Each structure stands twice: as structure tokens, then as C-alpha cells.
Amino acid sequence: LVGQAKYVLRFFFEWGGGCLWPGNEDAYQDLGLGPYDLLDPCPLPLSVATLERCWRMAEWHDTSLNWDYPPEPGPWRQPECDRFNSAVAELLVTIRGELGTKFQVIDKQNEVAEDPDLDAYLADPKGFRRDR
């Protein structure tokens, strides 16, 4: 179809992974499995500066998880979540601008928020149990 992007990409951060993933058959066939921002060389026409931002954001995202026991609350307070969410939105605008019309980048990133049980967890990490 005229005007339709050839490649569809899904944008979201995955623990220990990147943020740009295939979203259609053309992307899988021509670009591989992804995450594209971690492949060397990256198959996408993104600047080195943008790729470095992707890497830094992925590392930052990984700090939101409680790596000792992932189902328990992560360490981020709401201000950190808000900063991350804003940075994600800015990065997505940059990526879309650099990739142009051959790519459709679908935002699949869920906003992060402070875990409502964080205070209870921090008060007694060893004895913590979720109520839900």
C-alpha cells in the first residue's frame, strides 16, 4: 500500500534487553529477531547518539527491578518513575524522527509507577508478603 511503512517495530524495554523489537513479518525477515538496538551492527538507520541513549535507558530500566526477588517491589520512588517515563517519551520521538516513513514504531512501553507496597517491603524485606 502506498504510504504504508514497510517495517513495523515495537518499542518497549525488557529486563536485560533492549527497546526495539520486530512487529511484522518484514521486520523479522529483513532485520532479524532483535532487540535491534543491541545488535552490532544495528540494522536500523539510527545515529550512534540515539543507540547510546537506548543502551543507557535499558540499563536505567533494569535498575527498576528487584533483582533479588523480582515479584517483590522494585526500588523506584514515583519521582524516578516520572523521570524515566518522560525520558522514554523523548526517546520514542527521537527514534521515530530518525527512522522516517519506512518504519512504524508502535509504543508498547507501559508507564512505570512506584509499587504501592514499597514502604511495607522496605520496613521488613525478609518478612514482606503481598496482601494481594
Labelled PLM ranges:
Residues 1-132:
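Intrinsic low-complexity, intrinsically disordered or marginally ordered coil/linker segments
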